[in-house]
Amino acid sequence: MLEFEVLKTDPATVDSEGAYLGSYARRGQLTLNHGVVQTPIFMPVGTYGTVKGVTPQSLHDMNAQIILGNTFHLWMRPGLDVVAQFGGLHKFESWHKPILTDSGGFQVWSLGEMRKISEEGVKFASPVNGDKLFLTPEISMQIQTLLNSDIVMQFDECTPYDTKGHITTEGEARSSMELSRRWAKRCEIEFDKLENPNALFGIVQGGMFENLRQESLDALVEMDFPGYAVGGVSVGEPKEEMLRIMAHTPHRLPAHKPRYLMGVGTPEDLVEGVASGVDMFDCVMPTRNARNGHMFTRFGDLKIRNARYKSEEAPVDSTCGCYTCRNFSRAYMHHLDRCGEMLGPMLSSIHNLHYYLNLMQEVRGALDAGRFGEFVRQFKADRQRGV
């Protein structure tokens, strides 16, 4: 089940210089089998059935509404038979709100020379034990049906920006996009055959070529998926290329369907994505950066292992209400990082995820109040100020 309602759109406004500040931003509500999600939303990534270093209770406390699971990695470990014992991911990982699972396409793509792609699917060696495996659109749908995720992603080929220094040509991007399009249809047929009660999203591909993006979009819209994603961005391309595709594609998707930008990105990317008409985001950046002492704040990024923080009594971000900032100093966080204590990345992950989720809450509030343009100006000024 999926119901999506656009509650409000960004009104056209002008700044003091008379510059147009209107955007494609919209405020929505997404109803899924395991709950209601307010959009725009950031979705923490739980690759192996867990958001790294963060308990489900902590995610609930920071108002996470939906998280991700990774079809490929959960297939590898613990294996489908184990998850099936629990009736799906929700009970297995004790998360009772919505879950989105990706199809495994990106992970198979990232195996590089260890995999072989054909019309039928992808042959590859298991990164766990070396077993020869075969993943097809049909098998991906079967796995995700067993996982019982609220949102199921089609199996696709992630078009790379470059391969060993060779930038993907338009012809190569077209072949990849057309394969993903054919796989989308096979996913749709298998999904319906399985009578999966959840929602299947199509994924727009096409590399950095706007004409291919449009062709992919048109074909997927004709299939009438409940929702759509923009894939194949943040895969090594220059930032300006990613922003160009973001500006081109999301707002052209059906206005009455949810739009998901996959694997993006920085706080600035999220705000830019909202302005481009995106409703849903995911990225490993908050937790991955946290494990490396890189923390996001309202006033720019903070690298906690820097010696300047050795004796600072202030919290990571004095404007933040997360558990970390309410209880611990920069000096303590610096100490944990320097000692390699596991509590360090746990507290840093709590902070970074809270920052991302709160940023989206502020975006929703600005859209509700009809002041998104004003919010964007203040957000940019604050982030550029520096800690």
Curated annotation (Swiss-Prot):
Required cofactor(s): Zn(2+)
Keyword tRNA processing: yes
Subunit note: Homodimer. Within each dimer, one monomer is responsible for RNA recognition and catalysis, while the other monomer binds to the replacement base PreQ1.
PANTHER family, alphabetized: QUEUINE TRNA-RIBOSYLTRANSFERASE
Binding residues for Zn(2+): C320, C322, C325, H351
GO biological process, one term: tRNA wobble guanine modification
Gene3D superfamilies the record matches: Queuine tRNA-ribosyltransferase-like
EC number: 2.4.2.29
Family label: Belongs to the queuine tRNA-ribosyltransferase family.
Cellular component GO terms, alphabetical: cytosol
Cofactor binding, note field: Binds 1 zinc ion per subunit.
Classification via Pfam families: TGT
Catalytic reaction annotation: 7-aminomethyl-7-carbaguanine + guanosine(34) in tRNA = 7-aminomethyl-7-carbaguanosine(34) in tRNA + guanine
Keyword set includes Glycosyltransferase: yes
InterPro entries tied to this protein: ArchSynthase1/Queuine_TRR (IPR050076), TGT (IPR004803), TGT-like_sf (IPR036511), tRNA_ribo_trans-like (IPR002616)
Class of the enzyme per the UniProt entry, highest EC level: transferase
UniProt: substrate binding residues: D102, S103, G104, G105, F106, D156, Q205, G232
Protein name: Queuine tRNA-ribosyltransferase
Keywords: Glycosyltransferase, Metal-binding, Queuosine biosynthesis, Transferase, tRNA processing, Zinc
Active site, renumbered: D102 (proton acceptor), D282 (nucleophile)
Pathway: tRNA modification; tRNA-queuosine biosynthesis
Biological source species: Polaromonas naphthalenivorans (strain CJ2)
Gene encoding the protein: tgt
NCBIfam families for this protein: Q_tRNA_tgt, tgt_general
GO molecular function, one term: tRNA-guanosine(34) queuine transglycosylase activity
